[in-house]
């Protein structure tokens, strides 16, 4: 399991802070979960040398990076080129998802007509858009209409000058309008149909999360059946067996460092795909600790790594001029780990709360 852990950390830029551009890092990771606005910034800070907020703000405002519905039907940050090229692979999952949720409420919904009308009302927040949809399509439920638009129409969120680039209720625009290109055409990988996009998505997944099983890739992407895609790519891949004799796929030449490779302490943000990227997550967190990583309302907590594995969770609270980082370790921490976490935690506080006049890292003994 340590070999899989070190391979994952290497590909996730967590063995050493990478000296690459934020755009290159986002491409390497495929997509950063962005249900909340702050986590992608922290996720890049923990992986990159000398990363600043301004760098990601610039990429978003220059339209090189977008925040959009992507993996698992949730908001992610990814490069504009990848969104254009890879989204087609996910559309069948989006369509199946909204039909399963809406059931008879979407039975006679004309999606093409709905999308065409919605496009004329963008950019807008969904709070602004839903009433307009309801007036235009009065026989359908307002929220069902909004959800259908979100799952059927390629949309991106419009960044602002907020600290973390997006307000809690951000406006959406059509990807074609925002990027001046249609998804599926002229992307970073060229013009791809849905099948080509699916093959590309599998390769990119393995580059960022391999070696991995088919079920791992399905859990990460939200796509129900990736076996045909893996079978088509099998001649180009290498395979291994894990401790349960399950078949793992990988790219030839992808980094697989030795198990004894040192791994520094690292802080991961809420919803980080390092935690969500596999069906079997033992390579990053012990099974007995998994229930403690999710809140009652299914929020994935921010975590920290010691020796490459999740060793606890963290919260950050700002009270007036004081910022406090509180760690909740799963077990007692050795002195070297505590010292390293205190130093790394202070750096995290400086990044997240640069104007705080007092900062503290609290680690229970």
Where do the PLM segments sit?
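Long, low-complexity intrinsically disordered regions
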Residues: 1-275, 279-281, 286-365
């Amino acid at each position: 399991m340590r070999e899989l852990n070190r391979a994952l950390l290497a590909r996730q830029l967590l063995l050493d802070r990478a000296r690459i551009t934020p755009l290159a890092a986002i491409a390497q990771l495929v997509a950063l979960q962005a249900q909340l606005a702050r986590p992608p910034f922290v996720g890049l800070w923990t992986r990159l040398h000398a990363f600043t907020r301004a760098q990601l703000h610039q990429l978003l405002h220059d339209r090189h990076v977008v925040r959009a519905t992507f993996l698992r039907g949730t908001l992610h940050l990814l490069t504009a080129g990848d969104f254009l090229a890879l989204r087609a692979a996910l559309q069948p999952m989006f369509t199946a998802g909204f039909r399963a949720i809406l059931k008879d409420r979407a039975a006679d919904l004309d999606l093409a007509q709905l999308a065409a009308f919605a496009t004329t009302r963008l950019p807008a927040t969904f709070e602004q858009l839903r009433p307009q949809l309801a007036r235009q399509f009065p026989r359908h439920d307002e929220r069902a209409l909004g959800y259908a638009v979100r799952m059927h129409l390629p949309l991106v969120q419009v960044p602002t000058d907020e600290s973390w680039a997006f307000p809690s209720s951000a406006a959406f625009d059509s990807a074609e309008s925002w990027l001046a290109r249609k998804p599926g055409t002229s992307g970073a990988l060229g013009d791809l149909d849905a099948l080509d996009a699916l093959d590309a998505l599998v390769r990119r997944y393995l580059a960022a999360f391999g070696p991995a099983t088919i079920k791992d890739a399905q859990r990460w992407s939200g796509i129900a059946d990736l076996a045909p895609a893996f079978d088509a790519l099998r001649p180009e891949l290498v395979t291994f067996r894990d401790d349960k004799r399950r078949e793992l796929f990988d790219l030839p030449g992808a980094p697989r460092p030795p198990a004894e490779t040192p791994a520094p302490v690292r802080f991961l943000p809420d919803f980080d795909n390092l935690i969500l990227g596999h069906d079997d997550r033992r390579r990053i967190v012990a099974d007995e600790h998994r229930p403690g990583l999710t809140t009652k309302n299914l929020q994935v907590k921010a975590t920290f790594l010691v020796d490459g594995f999740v060793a606890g969770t963290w919260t950050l609270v700002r009270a007036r001029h004081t910022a406090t980082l509180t760690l909740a370790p799963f077990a007692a921490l050795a002195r070297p780990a505590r010292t390293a976490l205190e130093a790394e935690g202070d750096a995290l506080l400086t990044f997240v709360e640069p104007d705080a006049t007092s900062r503290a890292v609290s680690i229970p003994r």
